[in-house]
């Protein structure tokens, strides 16, 4: 499921965290202080969110450099999480379905611009929607599972055909190619196309063409075989209640859109293949990672099964995943040959994103030479706001309008008592709306804040906002 950039972590009870053994790697070993910082990011995130466990893999210089699992995989028997355990990766599965389509394209068996009607003629406006629009979520087909919980009907088995008989025959939510809207239905359709064109079950095709060549031995299809006693239990929470075992989706509901489970190490192997462009032809990787444009020319920040954006000034291919009991985050920085994989065993929780976005800056140097100066400026502005003042020459007319007398009083009364920040950290940077968005984490002994700024091309700030993290 897609989560907002500025998603706030839940304030939940602190868990006693159990560390598992870490595998050592002869090459691309991370510096000891970097490993310690990763451990702190992960343990802090689990403590703040109450998520039972996380499995983390880091790729550095194109090789697996770090594997570590944190917390308990099973709370009933306090089984420590280990790096070998398989977690459901949810919608991160979509990039494998997209890759299957691209591999069939390399064989000359289909085109990204083929109409869906060539393969499944009975679907709504099938002769207008293309495969490319399916994989980029620009088709208009309505999502069959936007909810963040398992409905009663989803506890029963289903087939892809039955899903499409309902959601594939509804009117489109918009004209194909005119909007971006996340829809699991797109990938069910794409999975059916893979099976029709290849003549094989989707997972068999993925096993032969992707998992076996990349030595991804842990991969399993949770639609066919549920996770076992040696794997983590998936958990949910009702509001701020205790973790409870999450219901398991009936067979078929996750087909092609979210059915895969694997170890963090195996997902990292996939990331390395993206970095090295070792599995598909260069033209396929170009399609995979190129931002899709709408008919009006606006970008979607999405390629084929992956988000395409900039993080700390670096090109990033990423996707999150969520199914019942599990969330995941997968970040790949192909130009820097870096990747971060985080798998967790609680749904509707922010730990996987918090860990991934906390670890990435530890591996990436900002390519913006102004970053240290902007960090110092942000801290100075924050400290001035603690006293109810600002240097108005730093801001645009819009921002100066926002910082009215009442606003400054509220900033001072709420921020002043916090005192001097223990840490003031630059965590994210990207372009949005023609402006540079910079995100900062501000840490105090008993609380954390998030600040974010929008900088205009002339260097003036259009926005300086602050919210609570816990």
Model-flagged regions — what are they?
Residues 389-434:
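Short solvent-exposed beta->alpha transition segments
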Residues 429-470:
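Exposed beta-sheet edge and beta->alpha loop/turn motif
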Residues 72-75, 127-324:
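Short, surface-exposed loop or secondary-structure junction motifs
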Residues 343-407:
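Short, gly/Ser/Thr-rich active-site loops of penicillin-recognizing serine hydrolases
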Residues 9-23:
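Bacterial N-terminal signal peptides
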């Amino acid at each position: 499921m897609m989560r907002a950039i500025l998603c706030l972590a839940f304030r939940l009870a602190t868990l006693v965290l159990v560390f598992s053994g870490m595998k050592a790697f002869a090459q691309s070993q991370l510096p000891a202080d970097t490993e310690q910082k990763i451990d702190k990011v992960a343990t802090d995130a689990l403590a703040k969110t109450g998520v039972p466990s996380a499995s983390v893999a880091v790729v550095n210089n194109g090789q697996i450099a770090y594997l570590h699992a944190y917390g308990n995989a099973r709370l009933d028997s306090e089984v420590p999480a280990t790096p070998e355990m398989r977690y459901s990766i949810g919608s991160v599965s979509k990039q494998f379905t997209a890759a299957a389509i691209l591999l069939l394209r390399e064989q000359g068996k289909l085109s990204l611009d083929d109409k869906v009607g060539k393969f499944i003629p009975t679907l709504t406006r099938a002769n207008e929607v293309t495969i490319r629009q399916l994989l980029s979520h620009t088709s208009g087909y309505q999502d069959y599972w936007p909810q963040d919980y398992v409905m009663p009907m989803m506890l029963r088995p289903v087939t892809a055909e039955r899903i499409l008989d309902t959601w594939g025959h509804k009117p489109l939510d918009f004209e194909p190619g005119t909007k971006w809207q996340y829809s699991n239905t797109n990938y069910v359709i794409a999975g059916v196309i893979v099976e029709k064109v290849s003549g094989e079950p989707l997972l068999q095709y993925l096993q032969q063409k992707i998992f076996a060549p990349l030595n991804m031995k842990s991969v399993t299809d949770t639609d066919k075989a549920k996770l076992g006693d040696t794997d983590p239990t998936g958990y949910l929470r009702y509001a701020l209640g205790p973790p409870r075992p999450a219901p398991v989706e009936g067979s078929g509901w996750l087909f092609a859109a979210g059915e895969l489970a694997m170890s963090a190490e195996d997902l990292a192997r996939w990331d390395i293949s993206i970095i090295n462009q070792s599995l598909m032809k260069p033209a396929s990787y170009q399609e995979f990672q190129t931002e899709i444009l709408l008919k009006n020319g606006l970008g979607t920040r999405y390629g084929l099964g992956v988000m395409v954006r900039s993080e700390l000034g670096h090109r990033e291919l990423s996707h999150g995943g969520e199914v019942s009991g599990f969330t995941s985050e997968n970040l790949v920085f192909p130009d820097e040959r870096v990747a971060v994989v985080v798998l967790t065993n609680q749904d509707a929780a922010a730990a996987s994103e918090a860990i991934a976005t906390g670890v990435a800056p530890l591996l990436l140097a900002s390519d913006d030479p102004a970053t240290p100066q902007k960090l110092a400026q942000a801290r100075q502005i924050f400290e001035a706001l603690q006293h109810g003042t600002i240097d108005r020459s730093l801001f645009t007319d819009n921002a100066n309008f926002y910082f009215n007398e009442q606003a400054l009083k509220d900033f001072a009364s709420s921020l002043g008592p916090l005192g001097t920040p223990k840490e003031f950290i630059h965590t994210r940077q990207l372009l949005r709306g023609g402006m540079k968005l910079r995100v900062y984490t501000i840490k105090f002994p008993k609380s954390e804040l998030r600040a974010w700024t929008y900088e205009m091309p002339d260097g003036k700030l259009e926005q300086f906002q602050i919210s609570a993290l816990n």
